[in-house]
Amino acid sequence: MPVLPDRDVIDQLFSGNSADPFSLLGMHAADNGLQVRALLPDASEVWLLEQQTGRRLVQLNCDDARGFFSATVPRRKTPFRYQFEVRWQDHQQIVDDPYRFGTLLQDIDSWLLAEGTHLRPYERLGAHLSTLDDVEGVSFAVWAPNAQRVSVVGEFNFWDGRRHPMRLRRENGIWELFLPGVKAGQLYKYEIIDCYGNTQLKADPYAFEAQMRPDTASLVTPLPEVVENTPQRQRANDFDRPISIYEVHLGSWRRHTDDNFWLSYGELAVQLIDYVKDMGFTHIELLPINEHPFDGSWGYQPLGLYAPTRRFGTPADFKDFVAAAHRAGINVILDWVPGHFPSDAYGLANFDGTALYEYADPREGFHQDWNTLIYNYGRHEVRNYLAGNALYWLERYGIDALRVDAVASMIYRDYSRAEGEWVPNYYGGNENLEAIAFLRYTNQSVGKERPGAVTLAEESTDYPGVTLPPESNGLGFHYKWNLGWMHDTLNYMQCDPVHRKYHHNQMTFGMLYAYTENFVLPISHDEVVHGKKSILDRMPGDAWQKFANLRAYYGFMWAHPGKKLLFMGCEFAQGREWNFDSSLDWHLLEGLDGWHHGVQRLVRDLNHCYQQQAPLYERDYRPDGFEWLVVDDHDNSVFAFARYDAHGNELIAVSNFTPVPRHHYRIGISRPGEYREILNTDSHHYHGSNTGNQGRVVSEQIGNHGREHSISVTVPPLATIYLLREAQ
């Protein structure tokens, strides 16, 4: 007869107070043979089978009506491979016992995970299709150090938390279990009895696929294969290359006209990628595509950091979308949100009954602006979770760059908080030293592990050294959004032209700090929502002037030092604000050729000109790549500057932000010669007035602006022109 455990030990197993079911269940050596114990609620009969032969060895006794069975295999001393033949109420089944398998995490993984230096924790945590002892199944692992019990529940066990309690690895707080027979595509969650005895159902933080709202389960999905980074894609991210970014919200770029439903990843891989290629953009930036519960967050409140949203298809479909962009020569940037997460009950919040992923003190852990929770960057395991996620997208999906959202909210403890609502750091300051250390660590990891991939920061303050390396006391980003330039120049453009002379410095101020960081000039989604109006509608004047102003502004922007970013719809001057719940206004491009077509053609030509003319990009971050020619003509609201490449090639941009054409306008130049007009935003081609310079101008030895030579040009009304110096 089998030796039964104490009744209270069995009770602990069923009540959820047993953190080590493996000490009780499975096969164990005993004086009289091998003891076999099984937890099979609702089973009526259980036999032990020899796996190799399928022979019945012994029937297990039902020692507890709740489903505890045991038996002794006499005269056997060495554990062997076995199975159970289980009779349920209406069918019979042969199953492998999950409690006959050993520990899953290797010692080195356990050490690195606890230390917070495991570069790829997603390779060990989560749900992984595995084969152990020639048995196929899934290895589950989840971090919940303060839980009393964790069970895997899903379609495969009737969502019954009694059936498959997990083993706790006390050295790192990770619960693990290999479940034979579980297959790809099956739904699962973790049933957690937390430190207070409350039962919670949690999605897997490391799930590679998740259900779309309103459903919340995780899906067993293979870990995507690594995507190699090509030299061409690495080179396209360099500081001396043209970078023109098309920012896109996949759910509202274009929709099916019959039912207003989203395009799939497959449809976007054709329609969107072809469009971006035709328009001349070099990069596409996706608003967050991590699984998220609330459409109105635009993806910026993700709960499935490792799972591409199923709104548009499967993870494999998304990977194909990225590959399609790469085949078209377009790099993919992903908006990444390591700053906060929503408090939905099935997610990370209060994961094991404690503030595990978030700061416990709401003065540190609650984000008042978004009603979300802030990651506890001081915990090794949280840093692992986030930094590993960055590498996951870069390596497993071939993403070329990550744009980190809301950096200022991460690095300042008093961000959007009044006095008394925040906790100073160890030194009494307002910097979140843990978040700063996390960002530096992540950026260093990206640089070492994925050469050629880059990170971009949306940082809204003047925090110093965002794009300096950590060893120079910087944050280690490659690029930073220049939000100051964007605000200043848009404020200028909103002024009536008659008043612009009083705001002249708003267009020039950006050059005073242009070389302090590696800047991207962003006209992003944030500028066309929440009552700010569309970019077109911000322009003053009648319809003709609005479009002319916008074209002139784009011309100025594309010539200005800094990489370019434009949100979808702005490239054809959509007239209304962006609405995440409907398609862009593509009907504006239907019918007869009009002003919207003109702006679209201009942006296309600007992008192609930008890529073809090295002076416009090669020395974006070097002072010798830029020279003001006309900087102080307030009265005429005219600006002129020269751009230079490494070989001395020169391109002059001249902008007139009044509706008055400037004929015979003389500009002092540094190098005499003949200049060809290669772009004019006032061209008939763009629905302008077609005022210009008949293709070229020639310098004269007439002093102006402190220079010996000058050119006399016609600067069209509300327009920007590009003049390329011909080779001599």
From Swiss-Prot:
Could you tell me which pathway this protein works in?
Glycan biosynthesis; glycogen biosynthesis
- Leader sequence range is none
The cysteines covalently paired via disulfide bonds are none
* Record's GO cellular component terms: cytosol
SUPFAM superfamilies hit by this protein: (Trans)glycosidases, E set domains, Glycosyl hydrolase domain
**GO BP annotations, alphabetical order:** glycogen biosynthetic process
What InterPro entries does the annotation carry?
A: A-amylase/branching_C (IPR006048), Branching_enzy (IPR037439), GlgB (IPR006407), GlgB_N (IPR054169), GlgB_N_E_set_prok (IPR044143), Glyco_hydro_13_cat_dom (IPR006047), Glyco_hydro_13_N (IPR004193), Glyco_hydro_b (IPR013780)
The active site annotation covers D405, E458
Q: Which residues form a coiled coil?
A: none
Q: Which UniProt keywords apply?
A: Carbohydrate metabolism, Glycogen biosynthesis, Glycogen metabolism, Glycosyltransferase, Transferase
Which molecular-function annotations from GO does this UniProt entry contain? 1,4-alpha-glucan branching enzyme activity; cation binding; hydrolase activity, hydrolyzing O-glycosyl compounds
The EC designation for this entry is: 2.4.1.18
The protein's assembly and partners: Monomer.
Cited function: Catalyzes the formation of the alpha-1,6-glucosidic linkages in glycogen by scission of a 1,4-alpha-linked oligosaccharide from growing alpha-1,4-glucan chains and the subsequent attachment of the oligosaccharide to the alpha-1,6 position.
Q: Sorted alphabetically, which HAMAP family does this protein's record hold?
A: GlgB (MF_00685)
Its name, as the record gives it, is 1,4-alpha-glucan branching enzyme GlgB
Q: Which organism is it from?
A: Serratia proteamaculans (strain 568)
